[in-house]
Amino acid sequence: MTIAISAALTSVVSSCQQAQRKNPLLEESKLPYGAPDFSKIKTSDYLPAFESAIQEQREKIAAIVDNPDSATFENTILAYEESGRMVDHVSRVFFALTEAEKTPEITEIEKAVMPMLTELENEISFNMPLFERIRQVYDRDHETLQGEEQKLLEETYKEFVRKGALLPDDKKERMKAINLRITDLQQQWGDLLLEATNNAVVWVDSKEKLAGLNEADIEQCKKDAESRGGKAPYAIVIINTTQQPLLASLDNRDLRRQVYEASIHRSDGTGKINTYSLVSEIAKLRAEQAELMGYPNYAAYSLEKTMAKTPENVYAFLKSLIAQYKPEADTETKAIEDFARQTEGADFHLEPYDRFYYSAKMKNQILNISDDEIKSYFTVDSVLINGVFYAANRAYGLTFKQRTDIPTYHPDMKVFEVFSLLYSEENREIGRAHV
């Protein structure tokens, strides 16, 4: 009985402590630039933060709609712009994490959050009293406002129109359903692609078949095999790109073929996973979206807000690139194939899984240098500081200074202040970069 009472009291105390703890995602950050304090943020904070932020925006939207005063830029356009600040903040923090370090826990939260955000977007986009207030301000003030205010008004009004605010009621309902379905399909596709990539492994039964790899790569293959159940002594894990770096070193051509095919077939139905039906349905729904909005196809609809503007401009740009690059690519391919035939015979035909391998050998013979020799010059820090930061400075006048007082969500991540030489001395700090 005493033990039971003690356990119950402990549970109550723990619950009270949790209730008293403020969600750091919803609190104003005390860190420089308002950076999220990852030393305080827990995985369990994200879903409640989204729920709270979404409810906050709903309440602010309701306040705009219920305002008895005539619609103005301040009480409607600016108020609407401000209404989603917290949702935007939580989203930026969370989705940066999903792109860089997606754990099973984060994946489950994402599955719960995406429909919530889509439902919120539907509610706002098809909130006719809200749109009527926005339209009143647009019709009255879009030619008299200046600068940023005019730009914000135009962007707000046009975004509502692009999402279907002017559609008949039946088409609005269809657009809502399409939005929700696409969100669901995209989640399924992302989950399957991640599963396919994580499961894409080529098992190797002997060290001899790994000839050409350096000892560090061979040791990594051994560790990867052990961590994945040890079906064979070695495993080549497929990374999330079509071409695989190890193809440049593997002497065994059949193994190169297996690695390449494991990469390109990871989710096309050759193995357990097939995303074709998902992609096909997404494409059909996007085409229907475009048709509802009066566009000939989804490309025309999606490109309207981009620099390219139209599919025709994209095709023209691609054709100009092909005209310039294809002859060079063909010449290079022939040179690599001719080089390979010196050792493989005149009938040798260069396959996609051969290109990296013979290109590296040709470079080594012509320039007397190998990829292994230059790897030491391409450490992460060197690429970042001597490559990315150097180029940004030369091209845009940006400089970077590391900050060690801003917590990150991963020990390898670094934070840098970003300065611009285009501004005066007191205004040169323009933000931060997490890398």
Name each model feature, range by range.
Residues V12-S15:
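C-terminal motif of bacterial Sec signal peptides marking the signal peptidase cleavage site
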